[in-house]
Amino acid sequence: MKKLNSCDGLYHDSLDVRFTKACDNRCPFCIEKNGVDEKGTNIEKMIESTIKSPKKDILILGGEPLLMLDKVYEYVKGIRSHVRNIYITTSLPINIVHDYEKFEAVMDMIDGLNVSLQHYDDDINNDIMRATRPHQRIGVLLKRICEDENHANKVRVSINLVKGAIDNQMSLDMFIRKMESIGVRHVKINELQHEEELYVSFEEIFKDKLKKSNIKLKSPYSHGCQREISLKDYDMKITLKRACFCVNGNLDATLSDMFKAFKKQFVKIEPTQAVLYENGDLASGWMTKE
């Protein structure tokens, strides 16, 4: 896998879709907490705007999009033949259990399901997310999804490194092994951005595992903040997304970072991000209340 830096404009063919601002969790580090207010979902306009957009990789986000499972199904069905890839990011709300047949129909049409978790223990995961409708989304629902061979291949589980939760080698090791045990085949490990007080360094807590696997991590800013790593202790695909000084004021820039930053002053990077809001409006980036 190529090492990626999203700030370098490499995701030029992606359309972020905020399907809804509604969510049944209240994560303290939610990246959408300062986003603009709910605009009211209009599926027909969303489908029309998506088809008109030149972007061909669609990432459906929230809030929690699968709270509106029927509308997600309608939207995905409406755009499927017009785009290349469709991905959904979710924390697996309980209403999936209540209409699992519709969820399976959505899974059959999409290319990837990005599942956001905060812990390997269901109760702790619910607590960290401040879930308003807690349920066994890992040991029961996620396991059920992964029992289907075709669906399991589409699942990627994302875990944030957060102080007080997954913040040391033992807890991260237990998380990865728990995912392996229920049939997950791909895990993405994220360092927090713009949350200095809660930040945990992957390189620091997993230094023994990295050494054992002969992996030396270089500056995420200069050499790619997202990359795949192959750790000897695990039989699964692992993607690592690290933070740099641009998104964490407590991190220092290396000499190579300063050189790259200097060069970027003379290289114009065209803005490539596009965001579709739930009312069908397209924007050149994520809008905030500020």
Task: Locate each region found by the language model.
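Core AdoMet radical
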Residues: S14, I31-T41, K55-M68, H82-H98, ...
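Radical SAM enzyme core and accessory elements
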Residues: M1-G9, K260-E290
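Surface-exposed amphipathic alpha-helices with a cationic face
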Residues: Y73-S81, L142-N153
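Distinct, well-ordered alpha-helical segments
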Residues: D70-V76, I96-V106, I166-I176
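Canonical Radical SAM [4Fe-4S] cluster-binding loop centered on the CxxxCxxC motif
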Residues: M1-K45, S53
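Radical SAM enzyme [4Fe-4S]-AdoMet core and its adjacent flexible, acidic
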Residues: K39-T41, D123-I128, T132-G139, K154-Q265, ...
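Acidic (Asp/Glu)-rich catalytic clusters
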Residues: T50-K52, F103-M109, K143-H151, M179-S181
